[in-house]
A protein has these predicted regions:
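Long, compositionally biased charged/polar stretches
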Residues: 1-628
């Protein structure tokens, strides 16, 4: 058996460390029932000051953008005074007697901000917020942000838009995303299925479906008379995005607005092999699961009917993305492994050493999400299409239906029938993700082979087997379909399992988190809820019907602020481990991994010269862990 100076499988001196951490890391199954989350986040799992520095920098930019939108821009000098005065009012006015100590402490922290003129880059705002975090604590920091946000929202624009240009007025400082200029194009709509914020939905069609009665006339109107449904089906060129998981969702409300969430079915096709452009094309949409209640809409339908139907698909996609692909299948998926690792593996166990850098900030951000984002009255409740209770159920359903062994990237692609580049030539997410998956798999294989020579070594590692048992236990991580008959029997399985955990914590999260800023923050391009029923399509759809489907301006501003923040914080990057984290014998293996990542960066950059840019899986843009 191969061992390292750090760990001996038969006599670990760190067993007491595990016993102690079990008391610190307790499970809670009531946050988002029945999922496993941490009960109380241990102090050592909190974010670093470097992370908070990135956070407050983005908060400042969003704050300035919102202040100008809601209160006007009277020029740079006056704006600096406006910012200073606004924060002073937020801190000082209407302070409750019980909060006077907070006021006094904040005034002591940053008198230069409140009493002096502000610099051109507003860096005093950064200094104030960081000082509050360091000297007053997170509760006071959150209180201050709450005060600022409440006062800031008092002047926000309201109501439905009369033109798409109205949404651009919400970005006087922030850059208007490039996607805002292309999202109306059918090519862009289809491209989102393979390189968008949720490139995980489409499945190859193997047979016609009774609840989606598309006919050749629908198909040929888009793909041409020299093609047919039967031929496309036979050649494996038909792909479906079916949002049936959203069927019967309970529509939410916010303020005076009724919101809607839909369960559409969208058909896409790849042109025949002789075509020079074989990018995915949108063919037809049915805006619900019942064909009797929902007509089939195609690009040849009324212009605004098609745009309305497309938007319904996008709304379903954003809701599935946030609840299932993002929160459920990355954040909470990884969270269960953080807890089991902390509770069962000594700090000097080789698997713990390998995984821990990919867990930094995960328990803290998951706890913040359940307290702030998916709480009643939080951003999810305000912005997404269904009720908060329905959204939480969707998160749980999405994760509980995501079996671990079937979640391996190659298996996922094969199960959906999208693994063959000859059938689906243009799929940037697939192509780039496989590069990262294979590089991580090689690194994990090289690393674990230092410590385990045979399958017997794996089976005899009692800490590892305890970890595997807790990961799947009802009173543990509750991860479905984990292991080989309830344990880990082979080195190959251990390598695959560790690869999936690291891939999910890095590349997969990067692929679904960072498009929130570029592709989802501009509400017209990616609405988080609908504001008109799908039954509108039974009549003659007008431009104003389409505009009324989109979020009203106050909701659009909230969406802009939340998703810009979530998609802007990059903290550490894949493969960049702290010096000395691994023993010397591992360094050549790590060097090899890092060189592979550099080569992958070059390959993806070259690919982007020949396709619409897809950068979310560039190694330099993949964070080391889920921390936002």
């Amino acid at each position: 058996m191969a061992t390292s100076p750090q760990f001996n499988f038969n006599n670990s001196p760190a067993t007491n460390n595990v016993d102690h951490t079990k008391h610190e890391y307790q499970y809670n199954y009531t946050r988002i029932p029945p999922l496993a989350m941490v009960d109380t986040v241990p102090a050592k799992e909190d974010f670093s000051i470097a992370w908070y520095r990135l956070l407050v920098k983005q908060l400042k930019i969003i704050f300035v953008n919102t202040l100008i939108t809601n209160r006007g821009n009277r020029g740079s000098k006056s704006l600096r005074d406006d910012i200073r005065n606004f924060i002073f009012e937020s801190v000082c006015k209407e302070a409750l007697p019980t909060q006077l100590n907070i006021l006094g402490r904040v005034l002591q922290i940053a008198p230069q901000l409140l009493l002096a003129r502000m610099s051109k880059d507003y860096r005093e705002v950064d200094e104030l917020l960081l000082s509050v975090i360091k000297d007053c604590g997170l509760s006071i920091f959150r209180d201050l942000l709450g005060r600022i946000n409440t006062r800031l929202e008092s002047g926000h624009p309201t109501g439905h838009v009369s033109s798409l240009n109205d949404y651009s007025k919400l970005l006087p400082v922030l850059d208007i995303p490039q996607f805002a200029n292309t999202f109306l194009e059918d090519e862009s709509f289809a491209y989102m299925q393979v390189a968008g914020f949720n490139p995980l939905m489409i499945e190859r069609v193997s047979r016609k479906s009774a609840n989606f009665p598309i006919e050749d006339s629908h198909y040929q109107a888009v793909m041409g008379n020299d093609d047919s449904l039967e031929l496309a089906l036979k050649e494996g060129r038909l792909y479906l995005a079916d949002y049936k998981i959203l069927d019967n969702a309970v529509n939410g409300t916010y303020s005076r607005y009724q919101k809607y969430l839909y369960a559409p079915i969208a058909l896409f096709a790849v042109p025949k092999a002789e075509n020079s452009n074989r990018s995915l094309q949108a063919v037809a949409i049915q805006c619900g699961q019942n064909p009797g209640a929902h007509p089939i809409i195609t690009p040849k339908s009324n212009k605004y009917a098609w745009l309305f139907a497309r938007t319904i698909v996008t709304i379903a996609d954003t809701n599935y993305h946030e609840a299932v692909s993002h929160l459920g299948r990355t954040h909470l998926f990884v969270g269960a492994f953080v807890l089991a690792t902390r509770r069962q593996l000594p700090d000097n166990h080789p698997l713990s050493i390998l995984l821990r850098p990919h867990f930094e900030g995960t328990l803290a951000i998951n706890d913040a999400a359940q307290r702030l984002l998916i709480a009643p009255g939080g951003a999810v409740d305000q912005l997404l299409g269904s009720t908060i209770d329905n959204s939480r159920v969707l998160v749980a359903l999405g994760l509980r239906s995501y079996g671990f062994n079937g979640a391996m990237l190659p298996k996922q692609l094969k199960q959906r029938g999208v693994d063959d580049p000859n059938l689906l030539p243009v799929y940037p997410y697939r192509d780039d993700a496989l590069l990262i998956w294979n590089a991580i798999h090689q690194w994990v294989s090289d690393y674990l082979s230092v410590y385990y020579s045979t399958n017997q070594d794996v089976q005899n590692d009692t800490a590892l087997q305890a970890w595997a048992a807790e990961v799947q236990a009802l009173d543990g991580g509750r991860v479905p379909d984990f292991g080989e008959n309830g344990s880990i029997q082979t080195l190959n399985y251990l390598i695959d399992a560790a690869t999936l955990i690291i891939f999910t914590a890095t590349a997969q999260h990067g692929a679904v988190n960072y498009p929130q800023k570029d592709l989802m923050s501009y509400a017209a391009a990616a609405p988080l809820a609908g504001y008109m029923p799908a039954s509108t399509l039974k009549g003659e759809v007008t431009e104003q019907d389409y505009l009324n489907l989109l979020p009203p301006l106050e909701q659009a501003q909230r969406q802009l602020n939340v998703l810009t923040l979530l998609g802007s914080i990059y903290y550490k990057n894949l493969g960049n481990y702290s010096p000395g984290h691994f023993p010397a014998q591992v360094k050549p293996l790590l060097d090899k991994f890092q060189k592979n990542l550099i080569q992958i960066e070059e390959i993806i950059n070259d690919r982007n010269l020949h396709r619409p840019t897809y950068e979310y899986l560039l190694p330099s843009r993949i964070p080391q862990s889920i921390n936002i």
